[in-house]
Amino acid sequence: MTTESMPESTNDYQPQSIEAAIQHVWDEQQVFVAKEDDSKEKFYCLSMFPYPSGKLHMGHVRNYTIGDVVSRFQRMQGKNVLQPMGWDAFGLPAENAAMDNQVAPAKWTYQNIDYMRNQLKRLGLGYDWTREVATCHPEYYRWEQWLFTRLMEKGLVYRKLSVVNWDPVDQTVLANEQVIDGKGWRSGVPVERKEIAQWFLRITDYAEELLTDLDQLEGWPEQVKTMQKNWIGKSTGLEIEFPIASGLDESNGSLKVYTTRPDTLMGVTYVAVAADHPWARKASVNNEPLERFIEECSHISTAEADMETMEKKGVDTGIRVKHPITGDEVPVWAANFVLMGYGTGAVMSVPAHDQRDYEFAKAYDLPIKAVIAPKAGEEADVSEAAFTEKGVLVNSGQFDGLKSKQALHEMAKVLGELGLGEKQTNYRLRDWGISRQRYWGCPIPVIYCPACGALPVPEKDLPVRLPEDVVPDGSGSPLAKLDSFKKCECPQCGGPANRETDTFDTFFESSWYHARYTSRHEDNAMLDKAAADHWLPVDQYIGGIEHAILHLLYARFFHKLMRDEGLVSSDEPFKNLLTQGMVLAGSWFTQDEKGKQTWYSPLDVDPVTDDKGAIVKGTLKSDGTEVQYGGIIKMSKSKNNGIDPQTLIDQYGADTLRLYIMFASPPEQTLEWSDSAVEGAHRFLNRVWRQVQTHVSTGVVAACTSNDDLTKEQKALRLKLHTTLQKVTDDMGRRMHFNTAIAATMELLNDISRFKDESDAGRSVMQEALEMLVLMLSPMTPHASQALWEALGHDGLVLNVTWPTVDDAALVKDEIEIMVQVNGKLRGKIEVAAEADKDTILAAAKANEQAAKFIDGKDIVKEIVVPGRLVNIVVKG
């Protein structure tokens, strides 16, 4: 460094003054501003950017501390590091806060950004703030609008009717999570399913590439790749047609279904269609029960999770179709578990071999016909549940005896000859619906002209700016009611036209921010290709496992869209992925007679434990009221068990919080909060501080660089030091197990504390040990490490110091410990010179006081020496 603003070194560790001074120096010298530099290996470290909700929580702190530690470590490896930060600023919470507080979402968002930016700086996070983005800024979202218009021209965007959750009171579309027990979360009235026109991106055009390119991602957790594979859901099966038998005119064609289990075709006893399937609607005319059922289904959530758990219901439509092979009539039922938006909106139902079909058949007394047996000559037991495994076909006529796998080919052949079926590869993945009937989002750049139709907004007119002074009232779309936004001129014919009043799904913004960071100041293009290609792909991406599917899949998709637009050269956005675990804490509540729960902060409760130390209950510190223990659960506002990071920074300093976060658990595992462990981290930093201050109080010396002329004790400390350095380097660089790296430094400090040698050589060894300890801790505790680095006599920034290298000579032991066994049992230990020969080792073993008790007066039958490890003396008598 040095700087006048640094506080003078003191024997007392005073984190607040130290941290403020050092952060000032970082800002003043712009040490984290990254520039393209081909002379160094680049390292782009990115943590998922936050939604500016108002305050950082411990989940944020963990995510961002991990990223900062990785960045600082890689910088000390000599790499050119980029670590940016920004804000995922659009979204529903801002609208809700606006309605609650009568303030424009823009104002609320920008205030939160300012506050949270300061919190991030207080944590000592080394971000390049010159690259900061906020997705609600027009200079950011103009480029996603531009990309949308390019995709529109390429045919990768289309508009179609789609079913949504509609709140009839608020006159607005609800996200699935806003539907509570079938009712709107604000209005409390039953929601309706409604078809409205929405925009979609053809992500299915990239389904195969998104699937196969997962194999490139060797630095991703297998769990995440498996989740994405399952979400994409590639399958091979048959599309089968069931011709109309009765109940509808034959002009309606056949009912098409897709199945991955054609081996069960001969066990079909009914076909189920979605309640809003065209056939069901036609059949509902003059069919009151069916009409009522369709109306009932229009009020249930479209969320897949809800569909899985709800009671399965249905009504016979009266329509009959012909089994494609037997010609038997099969009833068509309208069922609430079939969605029109998935596949053909119809499924063939085989109760004997599908549990959902089985339960439905039992409920409505439909036939159950087993056509798969576990093995030839056996029968499947379907008396209590469906047999869902594959096996051998039975009761299947010409297909009897075939194995399930063989049946796919045989069924395809027969159905192909009949013109009623063909092999098909399907994907579970659906095109991405990107329209949101929200105000606080990026406007979709489309103009509707009565004469010319839907047109992209011309590039010269971008961005389509979102008015920032609107305060939503929760009813309808604010933009649709705002003529100053909605009314416009057709870019093609010049006539009166209307703007699209929907906004993009907020996943749109977070799908390309990683790329925009590389070109933050590029005003004339979405990306500066040279800069993007310099930094991309991201070398280390860090975020929660909850983003394993949607965000990470959409970001991969967007990266490929940008590649195909010539904006980037890489196929994938993120080379390595670390998914950090959640932060957990104890929880406490009371419950009234109506079952309503009130949650209390752990800071306000005194736990009561049983004789084994297990928590059984608690009492409020304020008045002694008894409270129930809710267990260790995720920190959350709703459970009132979060810990405010700011409080801990004020009390202990940022370095203590950072050190605790990195030490408490491996990054990919959950972290269980412990106040006492935070205090322990603070005590450790104080010990390091005092150790350095004690050493430098009599002056600094040159650090030791070799084992020449050192005593046994001095060599032992150097051995411990370089063994620790070897472990810490591997733990932090390759394994990313920061907790074990920190544990190793704690062990090292214990050895340093025990080393009492004020000779010149001893002080030189101590200087080396303390310097390396400070360097090893510096990624976790950058402020204290900077101050201690200066105290040890160094100028400049510790984060620019090259990571120390292991002295292999220090790892060589002059003496080694040998186990002494007698008749295979451990009887003693000896220390001998590392180069001692067999005779010397045996002599020392026999002279060992403990071992001699079992050897003296007995005949030695055999002597075994395993070099460097043990001696075994076999005796008898």
Swiss-Prot record:
Residue runs in coiled coils: none
Entry keyword Mitochondrion: no
Enzyme superclass (EC): ligase
Binding site for ATP: 637
Pfam families cross-referenced by the UniProt entry: Anticodon_1, tRNA-synt_1, tRNA-synt_1_2, tRNA-synt_1g
Compartments, record wording: Cytoplasm
Keywords: Aminoacyl-tRNA synthetase, ATP-binding, Cytoplasm, Ligase, Nucleotide-binding, Protein biosynthesis
Recorded GO MF terms: aminoacyl-tRNA deacylase activity; ATP binding; leucine-tRNA ligase activity
Location, primary (coarse class): cytoplasm
PROSITE patterns: AA_TRNA_LIGASE_I
Residue ranges of the motif 'KMSKS' region: 634-638
Residue ranges of the motif 'HIGH' region: 50-60
Recorded catalytic activity of this chain's protein: tRNA(Leu) + L-leucine + ATP = L-leucyl-tRNA(Leu) + AMP + diphosphate
Gene Ontology BP term (one): leucyl-tRNA aminoacylation
A cellular-component GO term for this protein: cytosol
Similarity remark: Belongs to the class-I aminoacyl-tRNA synthetase family.
NCBIfam families: leuS_bact
Protein name: Leucine--tRNA ligase
